[in-house]
From Swiss-Prot:
Family note: Belongs to the universal ribosomal protein uS11 family.
Protein name: Small ribosomal subunit protein uS11
InterPro entries tied to this protein: Ribosomal_uS11, Ribosomal_uS11_bac-type, Ribosomal_uS11_CS, Ribosomal_uS11_sf
UniProt-listed Gene3D superfamilies: Ribosomal protein S11
Function, in words: Located on the platform of the 30S subunit, it bridges several disparate RNA helices of the 16S rRNA. Forms part of the Shine-Dalgarno cleft in the 70S ribosome.
GO biological process, one term: translation
Length: 129
């Protein structure tokens, strides 16, 4: 008996005009995630995944490239206006925001959501180089 062809529906890309950009800038890497208003991820990119390894991962240029890559994929969803949430003390904070602005997104708001302990865990010991 001949097999019947399996019918699959073509996945429809949802159109999202407003969204959020979450930038996690650590000392070692930068992660850029673009989401819709509910927080469902549309696209993401990292400095390490963009071809940078080792100490080059933690540069502002690597964060800029990661933001460009995430922005290019999010453009396909029709994303225009974004609200930026920045977390962490890393060197890629500023350059990732500038790259998203240069990619053609209208930034409506920038919020720093870096977690600050109210005298929580003991921090790591100081480095001796």
């Amino acid at each position: 008996m001949a097999k019947t062809p399996v019918r699959t529906r073509k996945r429809v890309k949802k159109q999202v005009a407003d969204g959020m950009a979450h930038i996690h800038a650590s000392f070692n890497n930068t992660i850029v995630t673009l989401t819709d208003r509910q927080g469902n991820a549309l696209s993401w990119a990292t400095a390490g995944g963009s071809g940078f390894r080792g100490s080059r991962k933690s540069t502002p240029f690597a964060a800029q490239v990661a933001a460009d890559r995430a922005g290019a994929v999010a453009k396909e969803f029709g994303l225009k206006n974004i609200e930026v949430f920045v977390k962490g003390p890393g060197p890629g904070r500023e350059s990732a925001i500038r790259a998203l602005n240069a990619a053609g997104f209208k930034i409506t708001n920038i919020t720093d959501v870096t977690p600050i302990p109210h005298n929580g865990c003991r921090p790591p010991k100081k480095r001796r180089v």
